[in-house]
């Protein structure tokens, strides 16, 4: 997994627009379906197709597009959406732009024109990754599909008319403003701008073999970076590749460089070609940042994380399963109707789950939400402190009014028997009058059950904070 859904503060209500400076034709679809699907999967390619419908709608300033569309129509949460977007961005088919202000966050997604089959198969990284995914026979079947019989023109002479042979040259010069006409941005391949290669060391090594540094042109540098990234070559390994790829005219053969680099890799890796693999959460950049922060429960960083995390993603993490449609609808209702922040909703849902044996009764949740809204609770920290406060036991007189309504305040004497989260375990001790009513045997068993639950819950909080 790459970036988390909350890395850019991505929320369901955030608006988006889609840009596309080309016309998607059947050739593009063939390349996407046949060549890119084995690399990034059907979900990512399907998301690319799905987003094309919003290009024209994005020109309508009165039409508001939000990320609820992806969640509702594709039946995915924002974390899954971000994972598929990561694949499209990394493979070079999409660019993402974001703008934050005090009121809202807006995203612009730019669809990039897929390359031609010729460019795809000539890309040293894409072609190798495809070969690794589909193996030898299927790779050549795909390649053959895009081939066509060319007419041999070697014995023909071109007799095409030039423009000036047919038309008069205009004498009047007209200045035309074309700044508003979008430029068809071609496919640039896999972006390796954040990858570095020691070209200075390579230059020194080649100099010892009396090889001119002029041989490493701009295009050669691009290919060297691609091959070094693909095959994990150092400056010394690249030196051997280059020395074996120089033609009799003292020029670099790019085709030979690719062959030499491939052979070098195969010898080092028991004839196994490199595969396209998605980084695991432990090695991804976003996970690295998360591990550095590693917020502890009740810390400012922990509250900030709750404010940024989608409640749907939180539910998926807590229950280790996809939230149901009714649960997603309930979260959307809390956001839209009650205007609650992510942090408040996350505290609310965790509060209810831990008190209701991991269940989420909608009526109960909406009643709490309504009360919290009336109390003016707007942040995760405020919700946390208030949840601790209302969870404290109350005597018979003070709780009687709430018992009739079945409110979440009406904990009465059974409060000490409720399942309690770690951050709610510090309560006021019950009064002597209340304690006298309890049976000592029941108290002992209750304390054992309570401590066992708190031990289990503490472990859960520690796991979630990592």
Swiss-Prot record:
Residues 200-292 are annotated as: DDBH2-1. Residues 3-113 are annotated as: DDBH1. The gene is dnaB. Helps DnaI load the DnaC replicative helicase onto single-stranded (ss)DNA. During DNA replication from the origin of replication (oriC) in the DNA replisome, DnaB and DnaD are required after DnaA and before subsequent helicase DnaC loading. Component of the replication restart primosome, which reloads the replicative helicase on sites other than oriC. Essential for replication initiation of the chromosome and plasmids. Remodels DNA, laterally compacts supercoiled plasmid and linear DNA. This is Replicative helicase loading/DNA remodeling protein DnaB. Residues 293-401 are annotated as: DDBH2-2. Keywords: DNA replication, DNA-binding, Primosome. Homotetramer, higher-order oligomers are induced by ssDNA. The DNA replisome assembles sequentially on oriC in this order; DnaA, DnaD, DnaB, DnaI-DnaC helicase. Part of the replication restart primosome, PriA binds first, then DnaD and subsequently DnaB bind. Signal peptide: none annotated. The keyword Ion transport does not apply. Belongs to the DnaB/DnaD family. The lineage of its organism: Bacteria, Bacillati, Bacillota, Bacilli, Bacillales.
